[in-house]
Design a protein with these regions (language model features):
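Glycine-centered helix-boundary capping/hinge motifs
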Residues: 64, 109-111, 129, 152
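Conserved GNAT acetyl-CoA-binding A-motif
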Residues: 127-136
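Residue-level marker for beta-strand->alpha-helix junctions and adjacent short loops that shape enzyme
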Residues: 89, 140-142
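Conserved phosphate-binding and hydrolysis motifs of nucleotide-dependent enzymes
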Residues: 20, 80, 113, 141, ...
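Conserved acetyl-CoA-binding loop-helix of GNAT-fold acetyltransferases
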Residues: 101, 109-123, 142-150
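GNAT-family acyltransferases
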Residues: 1-106, 119-123, 127
Length: 153
């Protein structure tokens, strides 16, 4: 891998870090959860989920940032991902850098998405010196919209 393997962003309760092979089973379970994936086209298979995690790590290796694995600091339990992703040509407002998150449903409503996203925004503006970060979600996804509002987006 690369030097980015040891990089981590820490908050009071969370660690955002490079992906590890032992994250894949919990990530696959999260991506197979119909409740978590209800605003996406379909839940992911194990193979699709593993490929997504590998792609996230490749982006981190290439750029030094991306969608990081998120774990609880006190237990090192994987709870999902949060991070930044370049969207070069996908939208009318591209190129842009988006912030995104996806957490296991058992960790919802505890402030983890907001806490992790705040750390990512700090990284985006203070370290990467970005002028703007965007966020978007399905109109029906009120929980993600609430996180965006708490972030000032």
């Amino acid at each position: 891998m690369s030097a980015h393997l040891n990089f981590a962003i820490e908050t009071a309760r969370l660690r955002l870090r490079a992906w590890r092979a032992d994250d894949f089973p919990a990530f696959a379970q999260l991506n197979a959860d119909a409740q978590v994936m209800r605003y996406f086209p379909h839940p992911l298979t194990q193979t699709e989920s593993d490929a997504l995690a590998q792609m996230f790590q490749q982006f981190i290796n290439q750029n030094g940032w991306g969608f990081w694995a998120v774990e609880l600091k006190h237990s090192q339990e994987f709870i999902g991902f949060t991070g930044l992703h370049a969207q070069p040509e996908c939208f009318d407002f591209s190129p842009c850098v988006e912030i995104g998150w996806r957490l296991d449903s058992k960790f919802w409503h505890q402030g983890y998405a907001t806490e992790a996203a705040q750390a990512c925004l700090y990284f985006a503006f203070s370290v990467l010196k970005l002028d703007e970060v965007v966020a978007f979600t399905a109109v029906q996804n009120r929980a993600s919209e609430a996180v965006m509002k708490r972030l000032g987006m």
